[in-house]
Amino acid sequence: MSASESSATSSVAPHDHGSSQVETSIPQLETLISHLVAAKRSLSSINHVWRANEIVTSARSALEESVVVSARTGFLRKGLNNQLRLLYSVRAEVEEVSVRGRSEFAGVLRSLDAADARLRKTLNLLRETIVHASFRPEGEEPKSLHDFVDERGVEELNSALKSAIDRTNAAQTELETSNCAFDDELQSIKEALGNYRAVTKMASSRTSASSSSSSASNASLPSMSGVPSMLHSLEMHAQEMANLLESLVRHFDLCVTAVKHTEGGGAAARSITGDMPAGMNVSGRGGPNIEEGINANLNAPLDPLSNSEYREMVNVLIKDAAEAEDVVMEIQDRIGEMESIYENILGQRDAVLAVYNATTSVFEHISSLASARLAGYIAQAHTFTRVWNDEHEHIQGGLSDLSDLNTLYDGFLEAYDGLILEVARRRHVRQRVEKVLRDAKHKLDQLYEEDVNARETFRVEQGDYLPSDIWPGIGREPMRIEFRRISGGTLKGVQDQHPDEDTAPPSDPKDVANHTTDENRDEGETIPALPKALVEEALARLKARNRQAT
């Protein structure tokens, strides 16, 4: 103890009885040292204060980041919705092209199948219809109507139609492949959207649980409305912790002063304050260097204190010592609350970032599709439309040609039945002509015989009286009438169509040795003798066609 301290002690020693009772209540140096050690230990709470400052700074940064990211997410989401609507609109239009093309193509194929079936049926009827032998040269192999038809036109038409169908099928296959790839792209986007919705739902539920704001119920995007109030709460906690730490520092300074003013306490104070808790000498973290202040207080010269001032200081020290532990506990409670709030803020920030990342993932899928492959999918639809329009025109032309061929061949069948009826009609007319000829010949023969007999009777009765040269014809037989068959020439209409064909010349009368009315002679045209059943069948078929036509 120094001389000045001794003189000071001795000067306050003689007091009355009351003063001595007060002096006996002053704690011993060991008690003051224990309070100093406890005060020094309480200063470790400065780490909580530093942590509180870090939390406030980080939370403010997280809030700023969340606001920026949330704004970006909202902007992207608006663009995303527009892009999705446009994308699905394009897919719907491409699908409409495909569906319409398939429907039209299927309808055309059905029409082609029906036309081809009709043509095949007609061709089969031509094969089944055998030309009656009386129409053909004697000894010729039997022929059907199909033998008179050149099917090369049908084959060429079918080949052209097959090529058009193959090209349409190829274009349709390419479109279907393109649409499947488009659907795969959309499925990938749907999966990204599913992840986006799951992340958004989780983020919204997290923010809803941490915020009582009505906007937290909006499940579209996580709400940040509760973060400013939480940041304000962190700032209030940090400020209050700084104030509490300041009170602990004042208590520590008071303990140091009390120990130094106590006999033998100077060395103890220097020894105790020689190794301050970690963080006391950290500068540049937003607060003063507390250790420098403590060292300045420790090394400062002692101001003289009266006994009453000393006792008052000690009483304040003891009172503060009883509350120091509560202050430390309050700092710990506040830092714990701040950590919880900070974790909540970081969780909301992470939720916003997760939604942003999920949004950008969907946007990247759409951007990649739109920039690299969407134009190809649209172009494929246009290519199919162009090919189908061209081939549709070709197929329609082929369909018309098939119908014309069927009409032609069906007309051939009908014409053959008409030919049978025409032959039957001509034979009937020939029979009538022959009957007229027979009747006329019979009457002419009768007239001839009557005339001969009359002439002979006249000659017998009057011949002796008439000179022979009075009329040379008096002794001639009567004129005879002969019928001659002349081969028919070409009809006038046929001559107009084929002017180069020579018509058959009429038979020379000198070539006819014996003219007769026999209908089986070869002079003139030859009319086949057709069975009655064949004629009746042809007539029945013609009537059936007429009923179908009406």
Swiss-Prot record:
Name listed for the protein in its UniProt record: Autophagy-related protein 17
Q: Where in the cell is it found?
A: Cytoplasm; Preautophagosomal structure membrane
The annotated region (Disordered) lies at 1-23, 205-224, 491-531
* Residue spans crossing the bilayer: none
Entry keyword set: Autophagy, Coiled coil, Cytoplasm, Membrane
Supply the source organism for this entry.
Answer: Aspergillus terreus (strain NIH 2624 / FGSC A1156)
Return the Basic and acidic residues bias intervals. 508-519
Q: Compositional bias (Low complexity) at which positions?
A: 1-13
Family the entry assigns: Belongs to the ATG17 family.
Q: State the Gene Ontology terms under molecular function.
A: molecular adaptor activity; protein kinase activator activity
At the top level, the lineage of the source is Eukaryota
Q: Which gene name does the record give?
A: atg17
- Write out the GO biological process terms: autophagosome assembly; autophagy of mitochondrion; piecemeal microautophagy of the nucleus
Segments forming a coiled coil? 315-344, 427-457
A cellular component annotation (GO) from this entry: phagophore assembly site membrane
Topology with regard to the membrane? Peripheral membrane protein
Q: What does this protein do?
A: Autophagy-specific protein that functions in response to autophagy-inducing signals as a scaffold to recruit other ATG proteins to organize pre-autophagosomal structure (PAS) formation. Modulates the timing and magnitude of the autophagy response, such as the size of the sequestering vesicles. Plays particularly a role in pexophagy and nucleophagy.
Q: Which InterPro entries match?
A: Atg17 (IPR007240), ATG17-like_dom (IPR045326)
